[in-house]
């Protein structure tokens, strides 16, 4: 009898814990925000009221027990940034163009079109640009092309390879002007004297 009671208790606990959906996994309800709203009081969860941190029955930031969002319809994360222009054109033949600008200076544009089929099928070439301002005030502007050979960005903020030393450039130029007969390792049998300048 005790074994049946123990198994039944374990099953009830398991079913009870499985049936509860934690609020951190739920999306906010439409029209409600995370911070609560004016007049939601301090009777529910974290962040109820007008910027307060309510202490009540189990809600995340709402106005009642178990509520998730607040009642004020506010949004978190600062001011909303307007989209000042938006264009999206899809011509149906595979070519397209889109662009947008926002109120805080972010802009992007891209156009693309299919090209003649290559060995792997139809290739689409895209060209575009985007720009934005970093938190420290630096303007970032990037242009790019993307095709069957990859993504090719250009911008003054991108790192560049270090310059090739003069000695290496002279060596490369010498090798271009004086190619070897085979272009591969010859086992030390080339050059004058048979030892290629090595002294044994």
From Swiss-Prot:
Q: Name one Pfam family in it.
A: Chitin_bind_4
Which molecular function GO terms apply here?
structural constituent of chitin-based larval cuticle
Gly residues bias locations: 185-200
- UniProt cross-references to InterPro entries, sorted A to Z: CHIT_BIND_RR_consensus, Cuticle_Struct_Prot, Insect_cuticle
Polar residues bias: where? 101-110
Keywords, ordered alphabetically: Cuticle, Signal
Q: Where is the signal peptide?
A: 1-18
Per the record, the coiled-coil ranges are: none
Instruction: Map out region (Disordered) in residue numbers.
Output: 100-119, 177-200
Stretches assigned to the Chitin-binding type R&R domain: 93-162
Q: Which GO terms describe its cellular component?
A: chitin-based extracellular matrix
Going by the entry's taxonomy, the superkingdom of the source organism is recorded as: Eukaryota
PROSITE patterns, per database record: CHIT_BIND_RR_1, CHIT_BIND_RR_2
What is the role of this chain? Component of the pupal abdominal endocuticle. May have important role in the larval cuticle structure.
**Name of the molecule in the record:** Pupal cuticle protein 20
Q: Which gene encodes it?
A: PCP20
